[in-house]
Amino acid sequence: MADIKALITTVVTPLVQYPDDIKVDFKETTRYLEYNLTVNPEDIGRVIGRQGRVASAIRTIVYSVRVSGPKRVRLTIEDGQQKNS
């Protein structure tokens, strides 16, 4: 699990202005190994890219990692803003 976190961090760090704000959280569910990438709100456009191309490329790299068992890897990307309920 730590290898995938390191991979996500390594891929995203050169893209952002605020690398210290990169945070990768992990949660395991019955079907997925879920990784939640949070970046500074000013960097979200750089990580997603035009028409989501950068985000798609990051997901392709992360999804290509082999994991043992039937679970699949899932990556979500969020900015660091709090959501109002």
Swiss-Prot record:
It is found in: Cytoplasm. Pfam families: KH_KhpA-B (PF13083). GO terms for molecular function: RNA binding. GO terms for biological process: cell wall organization; peptidoglycan biosynthetic process; regulation of cell shape. Keywords: Cell shape, Cell wall biogenesis/degradation, Cytoplasm, RNA-binding. Disruption phenotype: Cell length is reduced. The keyword Nucleotidyltransferase does not apply. Residues 32-85 form the KH domain. A probable RNA chaperone. Forms a complex with KhpB which binds to cellular RNA and controls its expression. Plays a role in peptidoglycan (PG) homeostasis and cell length regulation. This is RNA-binding protein KhpA. The lineage of its organism: Bacteria, Bacillati, Bacillota, Bacilli, Lactobacillales.
